[in-house]
Amino acid sequence: MRLNIPTCLTLFRLIIVPFFIIVFYLPFSNASFYSAIIFILAALTDWFDGFLARKLNQTTCFGAFLDPVADKIIVVIGLILIIEYFHSFWITIPSLIMIIREIIISSLREWMAEIGKNNLLSVSLISKLKTSIQMLAIFSLLWKETYIIIIIGILSLYVSSILAFLSMLKYFYIAWRDLFRN
């Protein structure tokens, strides 16, 4: 297998995960800033690898598999770190909604692929919006530099969790007949 640029970017996103976690826990005053920077770098490579794969016509089966895996790993770890840091019901609930949604949708996509209908669950506009706001939420709550940034992060977290739930309902609506046929 030859690695192309988009796949290398996706692999880079996976490679930086341990550094993301380590930097988050470093006992330095600006460790939160650096962990937020690593997270946003991962988010940018997510956008950029998809853009390049389409632009350069370098989509591969391996890349199509690995990209969502890398996305889920960095987002779920970011949410877990935020839950751990804030120790708050108000942060935990929307974060868990998003984590559970990711697991459910990944399972639904896998099942739809098994029955030959994976093309029905293409990424929706609401999911793209959810992802953008989710990235802002995680970045802000990792950085937590000022009260305003934390408020922006919390508001973004709630908006993205609502969008996550709504997009999950949309995916279930699309798959409904297949899920409940005899």
Swiss-Prot record:
Residues 1-12, 82-86, 169-181 are cytoplasmic. One of its GO terms (molecular function) is CDP-diacylglycerol-glycerol-3-phosphate 3-phosphatidyltransferase activity. Its EC number is 2.7.8.5. The lineage of its organism: Bacteria, Pseudomonadati, Pseudomonadota, Gammaproteobacteria, Enterobacterales. It is an enzyme of class 2 (transferase). Residues 38-60, 108-145 are periplasmic. Catalyzes the conversion of cytidine diphosphate diacylglycerol (CDP-DG) and glycerol 3-phosphate into phosphatidylglycerol. Essential for the synthesis of anionic phospholipids, thereby playing a role in balancing the ratio of zwitterionic and anionic phospholipids, which is thought to be important for normal membrane function. Its main location: membrane. Belongs to the CDP-alcohol phosphatidyltransferase class-I family. Pfam families: CDP-OH_P_transf. It is found in: Cell inner membrane. It catalyses: a CDP-1,2-diacyl-sn-glycerol + sn-glycerol 3-phosphate = a 1,2-diacyl-sn-glycero-3-phospho-(1'-sn-glycero-3'-phosphate) + CMP + H(+). Disulfide bonds: none annotated. Signal peptide: none annotated. Pathway: Phospholipid metabolism; phosphatidylglycerol biosynthesis; phosphatidylglycerol from CDP-diacylglycerol: step 1/2. It is a multi-pass membrane protein. One of its GO terms (biological process) is phosphatidylglycerol biosynthetic process. Keywords: Cell inner membrane, Cell membrane, Lipid biosynthesis, Lipid metabolism, Membrane, Phospholipid biosynthesis, Phospholipid metabolism, Transferase, Transmembrane, Transmembrane helix. PROSITE patterns: CDP_ALCOHOL_P_TRANSF. GO terms for cellular component: plasma membrane. InterPro entries: CDP-alcohol_PTase-I (IPR050324), CDP-OH_P_trans (IPR000462), CDP-OH_PTrfase_TM_dom (IPR043130), CDP_ALCOHOL_P_TRANSF_CS (IPR048254), PGP_synthase_bac (IPR023762), Phosphatidylglycerol_P_synth (IPR004570). The chain crosses the membrane at residues 13-37, 61-81, 87-107, 146-168. It comes from Wigglesworthia glossinidia brevipalpis. This is CDP-diacylglycerol--glycerol-3-phosphate 3-phosphatidyltransferase.
